Amino acid sequence: MPYLNSVPFFRGLPLAERYELTDCVPRELGVKAAAGEVVAGPLPLADYLRLESTFERLGPFGIAVRGRARSALLFSRKPVRQLDGATIAVTEQSSTTACLLRLLLEQRYELKSLQYRRGQPDEADALLLIGDEALQAHHTNTCYPFEIDVAFEWWLWQHLPFVFAVWGIRRDADADVKKEVEVGVIKALAMNTPRFAAIAEDYAKRLALPEAELQIYLSSFVYRLSQSEEEAIERFKALANEHHLL
């Protein structure tokens, strides 16, 4: 995934010489995984849950946050509780966060008659952005006076972390491939975790954002999921299934 919060898994990944790495946004990754075009990767949680018959978890690895994500943001022209009947624009990149947004708006806030549109239509009442695009929009947005961090809203609602992605690998992959990929991910994560400052410095130039802000951003993510993240996965799965979002 071409996002800063995925860099700890992929920078210097020792698998690059043997395997082809595909760089795609979460929604596209889910489509490719469903089509059999992906062997392993940090699958968007919603897509992994849809594909559990084909994919299994790869170690305890994933992308989660306990509180604010800073890169899963709903920008709105009015306060969230006043969005009844609103048109909500949803980035083409999102899979799991789009599902989370619906749970928040329709179940937490009990909003009615919402219309969701993919893309970024100018007439939308609110706009969901994720990843680096959301990080940048936090600084550049001039159209939407209200901003909501949807991962933080989940935290306030469910008192649990939010898991954006879990590492999955095809169940029919050879055992040696599964082991090799897992070891590669372990090595990349071990190498990059102490280097968040250097990664932030690099991306500050690419994204034209403050280096200190990006270092804090990277440090806020959980890449080895614990029991609280596993509980969050089960809660999200139950709610998404209950409301027919998977």
Regions found by a protein language model. Give the residues of each.
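Hydrophobic/proline-rich hinge and linker segments of small-molecule sensing/allosteric domains
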Residues: R57-V80, L156-D172
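Pocket-lining segment of extracytoplasmic ligand-binding domains
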Residues: Y116-I199
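Beta->alpha turn/N-cap motifs
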Residues: Y3-S6, V25-R27, E37-L49, T54, ...
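Bilobed "Venus flytrap"/periplasmic-binding protein-like clamshell domains
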Residues: M1-L15, C24, R70-D125, I130-E133, ...
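Short, hydrophobic alpha-helical packing/hinge segments within bilobed ligand-binding/sensory domains
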Residues: L29-K32, A124
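Hydrophobic residues within well-ordered alpha-helices
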Residues: A33-A34, A240
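A short beta-strand-loop structural module common to alpha/beta enzyme folds
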Residues: Y19-L29
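Secondary-structure end/capping motifs
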Residues: A173-L239
